[in-house]
């Protein structure tokens, strides 16, 4: 994929040494040796010289934000990557992209109706619903895919259709939902708009080979520094409907049109020129970096085949912010996390707690409704999230595998 700078030169693949955080060390025992810590996330960015070159060009153009040439070029490049039938609005971050998606798809709510959504996702999803005037109605997840459960949603819709404004579907962990077509059929049957939060999924594909971005009314992405495709802070709203994307552009600029008159509710959500410039560089060589992340997952699957962990369906074609796996029990999960800590490997257990267990929603329970979330509770009790990096060192991959295997062998 060829991308040009403001001066017209073609961007080359990023330098071999990309900007990454420093390495910390862990002392294994008093007076003992130390080993480098394997971080959970290792952001990969263009080097200082490349960033300086971009900033010099921005300064010379004296255009730092407000839909400058880098932002326009970046939006076109995103569309070229995702598919020419799609339309893209860039935004300052993924949360603003989600707010824009809800506003332009469902309209401004008055907190008297609900959006169906999984509890098993990042807490910003339910917060976005509240900010746009809707209440969360939490549904359960599928035990095999860990994605939102169609049957759980249908049970709510059949009883409470008049209270439901739409569906806010998460592609959990940025992995394309294998049942996306079934969800779209459900939404069409009940005449409900459906928005997809694909925050960590830029570069992922659905099971049919289609890249994430073109399903439902729209999909959103986050380009946060922790994501496989990152600019620091940034996001995008993607849709097949150009009118919806145009509304999103107005929403992120106070509802202004060319006459400088505001014709709709809006806010400031514009992507800066330096973030767009970083995004242009990050697109160069992206597929190679994502392939290297999928290779890590393949090594994990092979190496942990007898370790009692099961990885997520369809993750082999995802961009892989990290690798999620389910242990056999809560005790096994505790053993795996303990073994990883002893081996100086950072890990997490996303999404634990799920949204409905966060203190804000426990304290303000009147704001939400919920189905039975038995599967959500079970998966949360057994989930572990393992580190995945661009071009992860084979020795680091082997250390992660050995640590998980050790937990199974020790039977802690």
Swiss-Prot record:
Record-linked InterPro entries: DegT/StrS_aminotransferase, PyrdxlP-dep_Trfase, PyrdxlP-dep_Trfase_major
Annotated Pfam families: DegT_DnrJ_EryC1 (PF01041)
UniProt KW keywords: Pyridoxal phosphate
PTM-bearing positions, type N6-(pyridoxal phosphate)lysine: 227
Domain of life: Bacteria
CDD domains, sorted: AHBA_syn
Signal peptide: none
Conditions for induction: Transcriptionally repressed by IdeR and iron. Induced during infection of human THP-1 macrophages.
GO MF, one example: pyridoxal phosphate binding
One CC-aspect GO term: extracellular region
Alphabetical GO biological process terms: cellular response to iron ion starvation; iron acquisition from host; polysaccharide biosynthetic process
Family recorded in the similarity comment: Belongs to the DegT/DnrJ/EryC1 family.
This protein's name: Protein Rv3402c
């Amino acid at each position: 994929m060829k991308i040009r700078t403001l001066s017209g030169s073609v961007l080359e693949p990023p330098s071999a040494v990309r900007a990454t955080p420093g390495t910390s060390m862990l002392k294994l025992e008093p007076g003992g040796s130390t080993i480098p810590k394997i971080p959970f996330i290792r952001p990969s960015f263009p080097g200082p010289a490349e960033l300086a070159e971009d900033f010099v060009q921005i300064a010379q153009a004296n255009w730092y934000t407000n839909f400058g040439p880098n932002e326009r070029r970046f939006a076109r490049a995103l569309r070229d990557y995702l598919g020419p039938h799609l339309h893209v609005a860039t935004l300052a971050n993924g949360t603003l992209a989600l707010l824009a998606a809800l506003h332009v798809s469902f309209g401004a709510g008055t907190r008297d109706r609900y959006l169906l959504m999984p509890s098993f996702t990042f807490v910003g999803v339910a917060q976005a619903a509240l900010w746009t005037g809707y209440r969360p109605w939490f549904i359960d997840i599928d035990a095999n895919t860990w994605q939102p459960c169609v049957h759980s949603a249908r049970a709510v819709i059949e009883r409470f259709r008049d209270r439901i404004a739409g569906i806010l579907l998460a592609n959990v962990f940025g992995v394309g939902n294998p049942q996306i077509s079934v969800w779209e059929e459900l939404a069409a049957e009940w005449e409900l708009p459906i928005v997809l939060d694909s925050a960590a999924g830029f570069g992922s594909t659905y099971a049919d080979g289609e890249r994430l971005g073109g399903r439902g009314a729209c999909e959103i992405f986050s380009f946060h520094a922790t994501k496989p495709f990152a600019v620091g802070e940034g996001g995008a709203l993607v849709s097949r409907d150009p009118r919806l994307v145009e509304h999103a552009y107005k929403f992120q600029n106070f509802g202004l049109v060319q006459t400088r008159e505001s014709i709709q509710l809006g806010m400031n959500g514009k992507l800066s020129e330096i973030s767009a410039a970083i995004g242009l560089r990050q697109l160069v060589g992206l597929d190679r970096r994502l392939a290297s992340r999928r290779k890590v997952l393949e090594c994990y699957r092979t190496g942990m085949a007898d370790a009692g962990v099961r990885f997520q369906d369809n993750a082999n074609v995802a961009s892989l912010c990290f690798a999620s796996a389910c242990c056999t029990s809560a005790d096994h999960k505790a053993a795996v996390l303990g073994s990883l800590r002893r081996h100086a490997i950072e890990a997490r257990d996303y999404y634990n707690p799920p949204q409905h267990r966060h203190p804000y929603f426990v304290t303000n329970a009147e704001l939400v409704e919920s189905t039975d979330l038995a599967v959500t509770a079970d998966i949360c009790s057994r989930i572990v999230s393992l580190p995945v990096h661009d071009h992860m060192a084979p020795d680091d991959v082997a250390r992660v595998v050995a640590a998980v295997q050790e937990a199974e062998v020790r039977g802690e």
